[in-house]
Amino acid sequence: MKKKALLSFFIIMGFFISACSHQEDMQNDYMFKEYNKGDKIILNSVNGGSKTLIRTDKGFVIEGEENKVLMIDFFGTFCSPCKEEALELSKLWKNNSKKFTIIGLTHFEDVSDETVKKFADDYGAYYFLSNDLQNDRIIAQILKDINYQSMEQLPFKVVMKNGIYQKLSNYWDNNTSTNFYLGKIPTDYIQNDLDKIYKEK
């Protein structure tokens, strides 16, 4: 019994170490103008280039890359787990680039593009990073789409295929599935989920 209690304690502690919460005044993320099907959102990356998100019935796709699995990552330049996983996410993206893409959205902060670019350079985040004013609205829409009711923490990721949120393995509870990754998740764990998603029609 003591071993089980001790194990549970370490799992919970590991979770809090692997995620950043934000204690500022948290606005109700459901108080926003929802996107309509077909709405287009142009995002610019601090690493160069732009992508257009298109609203689907239940999610988003990237214009011109509709056939790719899309991961949207909420992150902060202040967030230690976000820094720690950035290079690994870059490798994940490069290793899967024909079938998969990542869009990182800054959240919980108001910083310059230069600050986000420095984060990218310092920690190897070479995938698409948006520091756009529209980020919070996109994030609010995603949280409403998946009916997320808990405190927001970073990093936070969702995965979509054909504009539909995918079921993902729950790193913190192996007996359940979920539709988001919360906290720093090993990329080999994410890769296993991606391999399953690729095979599904």
Language-model regions: role of each:
Residues 153-201:
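Thiol-/selenol-based redox modules, centered on thioredoxin-like
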Residues 43-70:
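A short beta-strand-turn-helix
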Residues 83-124, 136-143:
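Structural microenvironment flanking redox-active thiols in thiol-disulfide oxidoreductases
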Residues 72-79, 107:
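Aromatic-flanked redox-active Cys/Sec active sites in thiol-based oxidoreductases
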Residues 77-84, 156:
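C-type cytochrome heme c attachment motif
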Residues 71-72, 157:
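Hydrophobic beta-strand anchors of alpha/beta hydrolase catalytic cores
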Residues 120-162:
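Short, internal strand/loop/helix patches
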Residues 1-52, 167, 189-201:
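N-terminal targeting signals for export/organelle localization
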